[in-house]
Amino acid sequence: MEEKYLILSIESSCDETSLALFENNKLIAHKISSSASAQAFHGGVVPELASRYHEHNINRLFVDILNETKIDPLTITHVAYTAMPGLPGCLHVGKVFAKQLASLINAELVPINHLHAHVFSASIDQELVFPFLGLVVSGGESCLYLVSDYDQIKILNQTQDDAIGECYDKVARILGWNYPGGPIIDKNYQEDLATLEFIKSQPAAKNFSFSGLKTAVINYVHNSKQKKLDFDPIVIASSFQKFAINEVIKKVKYYLDLYQLKRLAIGGGVSANSLLRKKIRDLNVISYIPQMIYTGDNAAMIGAYAYALIKNHKKSILIK
């Protein structure tokens, strides 16, 4: 008979405060509170503001989960939390809460690598089969991994400058659109209007790099304004998205072929992008794609990954 675990998981790496409760691999409660609307006023994430929102929300979300599930907190066996990477102040709030709670209820503490949890975000409601290629595309990172086991995750490629999600936000901002920029650009995407070529494509084996694309788009808009030339934001946004997503897909194909892999898992905020999801599904591989609610930062992916580690007597690798 399988041992019963009751796992509380905590995510606080950036601007989402999230808690989830798992009974083994079954998600029984999940709460997310985002400070994105407050951050939008500043055009991006302000770390101190995000930390304060975590402090304000984390206790409330825990109480909400207790009220919703009617569980006795003393029955919680494990407290999993995002240990890295992320904004230091935000991580600190989650870590302190997790440590204090675990100490009070005598639960085991489980630190989790946030990026690796993104790799396994699709495992919340489906089984992932090893080995597979893992793609994480978010506001903080763009990474590709060779995943052979829950604790055998080899980095193959990662961003050498700006992450793809950050570039989405910056491009949206220069076009006068709100934060976060990714959903807005994706919503306005029109393939037949993606006619601009800002920069040349890079070789697939090179590290992810989006700063050149971001700078080229910003310069294009600035130059157009200075010369009082008309420009269409939809054309610019569509051209940006088409190039950025094609760069990701090119690298995915390269590493699938290089390692002769037939499975691909994706995660991170940009994995919600409709063009990326379509192109992933068009690949001749088995694709593990998370539900939309699990693409951004969330405690469900932390808890699902924590359970897999606990069950298999493994620990999260606390390096990128």
Curated annotation (Swiss-Prot):
Its main location: cytoplasm. Fe cation binds at H114, H118, D297. Pfam families: TsaD. It is found in: Cytoplasm. One of its GO terms (molecular function) is N(6)-L-threonylcarbamoyladenine synthase activity. One of its GO terms (biological process) is tRNA threonylcarbamoyladenosine modification. Its cofactor is Fe(2+). Binds 1 Fe(2+) ion per subunit. It catalyses: L-threonylcarbamoyladenylate + adenosine(37) in tRNA = N(6)-L-threonylcarbamoyladenosine(37) in tRNA + AMP + H(+). SUPFAM superfamilies: Actin-like ATPase domain. Substrate binds at V136, V137, S138, G139, G140, D169, G182, D186, N273. It is an enzyme of class 2 (transferase). Keywords: Acyltransferase, Cytoplasm, Iron, Metal-binding, Transferase, tRNA processing. Its EC number is 2.3.1.234. GO terms for cellular component: cytoplasm. The keyword Iron applies. Belongs to the KAE1 / TsaD family. NCBIfam families: gcp_kae1, T6A_TsaD_YgjD. Required for the formation of a threonylcarbamoyl group on adenosine at position 37 (t(6)A37) in tRNAs that read codons beginning with adenine. Is involved in the transfer of the threonylcarbamoyl moiety of threonylcarbamoyl-AMP (TC-AMP) to the N6 group of A37, together with TsaE and TsaB. TsaD likely plays a direct catalytic role in this reaction. HAMAP family: TsaD. This is tRNA N6-adenosine threonylcarbamoyltransferase. It comes from Ureaplasma urealyticum serovar 10 (strain ATCC 33699 / Western).
